[in-house]
């Protein structure tokens, strides 16, 4: 990490036992950061998109490495459909339409890249910057501490397709592994900034590891309720909060990292870690575990 000239803050959370196999570190030839991460994403050229993703995906769909995809507007995966993304696939987000990918409750994403062939979500602009597009939202049916069993995320989305929450802590929204999310966090008119990755009511069967968020104008990783296991996450030069947990989440996070820079941090409340139970007391049911 000494190669970076800017001010860095390293945030490490580790979980281990004396009988467990030792985890890879972040230095040297065995670093878990090797190959799949990218600390200069604005220098990368992924070419032009030749396929368009738009509207509502209601049947099982596969994205192929041989194509470059343009994500246009709010793209919903719904109707219990499975969106499978091959390793090495690049998805360019259309900055003009505030592109956002929403995996609705009951639907699934299988985005399982490889250490040598990660999946990349990034801006379609030639000169990329934080907040170029929305982000990725996973909605599940695991519990939260809110009143009732169902809530909806804001961000100017379709209310019917943006609900989350339920009673199934063991629910499975799919896999995000060896995935990079770059230049997300677009500002909305009424609800602040998108998060690069929002997990709302996501259950513990969902696999979430080796995910890198770079240059997000909002929060990098935000978790509403649910019961998720997070490992080997990277937040790089996020403007707001790197890791935010809210609404009674029962999350576990280990071996993860935040790299901050004072020149791209928000003066309104930028921090590495935020763990709260609610935004306002009237939102939550204090009798709930979550």
Each PLM stretch: what is its role?
Residues 1-25:
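Bacterial Sec-dependent N-terminal signal peptides
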Residues 21-290:
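Beta-strand/loop edge motif enriched in small/polar residues
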């Amino acid at each position: 990490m000494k190669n970076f000239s800017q001010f860095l803050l390293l945030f490490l959370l580790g979980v281990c036992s004396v009988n467990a196999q030792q985890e890879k570190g972040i230095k040297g030839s065995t670093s878990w950061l090797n190959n799949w991460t990218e600390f200069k994403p604005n220098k990368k050229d992924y070419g032009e998109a030749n396929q368009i993703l738009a509207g509502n995906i209601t049947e099982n769909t596969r994205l192929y490495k041989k194509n470059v995809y343009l994500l246009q507007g709010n793209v919903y995966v719904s109707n219990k459909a499975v969106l499978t993304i091959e390793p090495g696939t690049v998805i360019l987000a259309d900055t003009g339409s505030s592109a956002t990918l929403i995996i609705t409750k009951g639907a699934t994403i299988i985005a399982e890249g490889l250490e040598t062939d990660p999946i990349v979500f990034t801006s379609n602009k030639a000169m990329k910057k934080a907040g170029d597009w929305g982000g990725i939202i996973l909605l599940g049916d695991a519990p939260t501490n809110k009143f009732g069993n169902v809530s909806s995320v804001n961000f100017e989305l379709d209310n019917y397709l943006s609900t989350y929450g339920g009673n199934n802590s063991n629910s499975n929204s799919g896999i995000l592994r060896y995935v990079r999310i770059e230049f997300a966090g677009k500002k909305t008119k009424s609800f602040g900034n998108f998060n690069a990755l929002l997990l709302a009511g996501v259950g513990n069967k969902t696999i979430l590891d080796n995910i890198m968020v770079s240059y997000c104008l909002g929060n990098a990783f935000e978790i509403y309720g649910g019961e998720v296991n997070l490992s080997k996450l990277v937040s790089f030069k996020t403007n707001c909060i790197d890791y935010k947990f809210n609404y009674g989440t029962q999350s576990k996070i280990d071996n993860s990292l935040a790299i901050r820079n004072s020149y791209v941090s928000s003066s309104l409340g930028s921090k590495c870690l935020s763990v709260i139970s609610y935004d306002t007391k009237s939102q939550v049911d204090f009798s709930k575990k979550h």
